[in-house]
């Protein structure tokens, strides 16, 4: 077995994970970063594939005849402090986009602009009338579960038509048990609800505008990594609090005095061997199919669409190339005769489909998209798996706070979306990494 690695820095702190948060912390602090993969960025990474090929390429070839995809689907940078957006732009010049998104009802071939509740005029008079009455006059009592919150917020009609079946798929069936989360994603404004029943309404929500690096997320990750001391191929298997050592899958170890961890909170608890009285909160995994195909005659222009259901089981379809044609092979960018797509399907955490199941699902998804005439010939079908993709909580759960508290007591600072078990975007994750990194910066003379 390799001898332990002794970090060559003053305060003995090391960073686990070179996703966006870990890279930001490493960039701001100068501390070493240990990453499981052989490249930076975590799930916020771009890759390339030639039509008809199964090989992932880390960079585009000179001729540009490749589709660009991302691990885990489209990661668009929304919100964020202006200072953070400037930081991103200096490292990787970015473009700004205005969201184009809809709820799509396949059986009716009906597109309703997002958010649904502000565009009731697209629905039938009967549905529109019921939905208005329920949203504006319904009692707003207490609720414990996401299901109860959805019914209280949107009424039985819209919950039955869209919000219920969508969240059944989005949460892999957990929506009837878990606590409500992220209400700002579906804001309720009575004036806009009424107005939207008869006329157009302005876009609202947390991601009406977003930015994305011109050369892909991998360009941002590489630029950040150049300012960091990143050790690749270091997958954490155990954290020994008594010996103050992190054990890696390759047999090596690293000593520390304190840790900055961006790894998922549940995984960190498991690897430390800590035992909590509270039952762990649930999570869902996501199987994302990245598809490159010739464009179908009914392919929408949306950046992404939400679905109340699909035969194959997916709940969201995103169109990389509708955001920017740079996701297409260079010969198709002027003609826009191809499309680069990501399709999301959720699984309860711990339930991993077999290779055979993934193949069957992939074939069923391609067939369904062809029936909808979104695509014609599929030239690339590439599945990616995100183990901890969405984090949830049980009603009244104190697991998250207890886990963070006990790790802090053992000199572990948890930072980032998955480490702190919250929903936040890339910009906020970079901000948190910079803050924590700066507070742990190596001492230097001014």
Features from the language model and the residues they span:
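Glycine-centered tight beta-turn/hairpin loop motif at sheet-sheet or coil-to-beta transitions
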Residues: 64, 249-251
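C-terminal segments that line or cap access tunnels to active or ligand-binding sites in enzymes
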Residues: 256-258, 267-410, 424
